[in-house]
Amino acid sequence: MIILGIDEAGRGPLSGPVVAAGVILDQDKIIDGLADSKKLTEKKRQSLYQQIITHAKAYTIVEISPQQIDELNILQATLKAMHQVANNLERQFDKVLVDGNKLPNWDYNSEAIVKGDSKIIEISAASILAKVHRDNICLEHDRLYPQYGFAKHKGYPTKEHLENIKKYGVLDIHRKSYKPIQLLL
């Protein structure tokens, strides 16, 4: 059975997109060290990212913008991203396994698995792709807006991030539907 693993990164931050990734692994090309991206060092994630995009049978990465998150809400934006991931890889898999407890409204043979990123290697691989991709976006945001410190906090609502928003203002990349941002508008 060919499994498509899907996971997301970036539901909690105040800025940037939510990112979903899907991975179909090549059973003949074992990638050692796959685990939940949050349990890996940045260096290990980067190394595994390169191995995954090189050796996976198929993969895709989808971004949903802060503006779309504001229009839909974060749950619906995440489900939309996951749906788009599955559609991008349609007819290449037999079953979809998604990290978490919610599935998009779709007709695919699928299952939501709580802590799936720690249990299913395809979901672990998707977790790594989503996290590294999103972190790279945050590094680009840091280059564009160095005073905000995106390289450090990755958009999460840290004390430093909130103080920098108060000091320098709300950017287009901030999620205006999120309460901490609304309070600063």
Swiss-Prot record:
Subcellular location: Cytoplasm
EC number: 3.1.26.4
GO molecular function: manganese ion binding; RNA binding; RNA-DNA hybrid ribonuclease activity
InterPro entries in the cross-refs: RNase_HII, RNase_HII/HIII, RNase_HII/HIII_dom, RNaseH-like_sf, RNaseH_sf
GO cellular component: cytoplasm; ribonuclease H2 complex
Coiled-coil spans in chain: none
Protein's job: Endonuclease that specifically degrades the RNA of RNA-DNA hybrids.
Family annotation (NCBIfam families): PRK00015.1-3, PRK00015.1-4
The keyword Metal-binding is assigned to this record: yes
Keyword list, A-Z: Cytoplasm, Endonuclease, Hydrolase, Manganese, Metal-binding, Nuclease
PANTHER family in the record: RIBONUCLEASE H2 SUBUNIT A (PTHR10954), RIBONUCLEASE HII (PTHR10954:SF18)
Designated name of the protein: Ribonuclease HII
Keyword Nuclease: yes
Cofactors (names): Mn(2+); Mg(2+)
